[in-house]
């Protein structure tokens, strides 16, 4: 698992999400879809007012080349959280 803040270009050790029931359901659906079809690569969950967004991605050896270069470096770096 990698938790990445693209604005600061830093990995995070943990994150807390406070979700509405609708947002939680949307996140669960997106995660389920990606688990069943990793080739879809990533999904987005937005807050009700679209002021915040969570991007989730599933990576495998087979779909790693579909990520941008920065993401590939992050995902290949096994020594960091």
Task: Walk through the language-model features, giving the residues of each.
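Positively charged, low-complexity terminal tracts
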Residues: 1-81
């Amino acid at each position: 698992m990698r938790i990445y803040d693209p604005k600061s270009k830093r990995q995070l050790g943990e994150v807390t999400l406070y979700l509405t029931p609708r947002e939680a359901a949307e996140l669960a659906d997106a995660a389920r879809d990606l688990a069943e079809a990793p080739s879809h690569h990533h999904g987005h969950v937005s807050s009700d007012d679209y002021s915040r967004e969570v991007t989730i991605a599933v990576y495998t050896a087979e779909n790693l080349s579909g990520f941008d270069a920065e993401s590939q470096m992050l995902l290949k770096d096994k020594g960091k959280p």
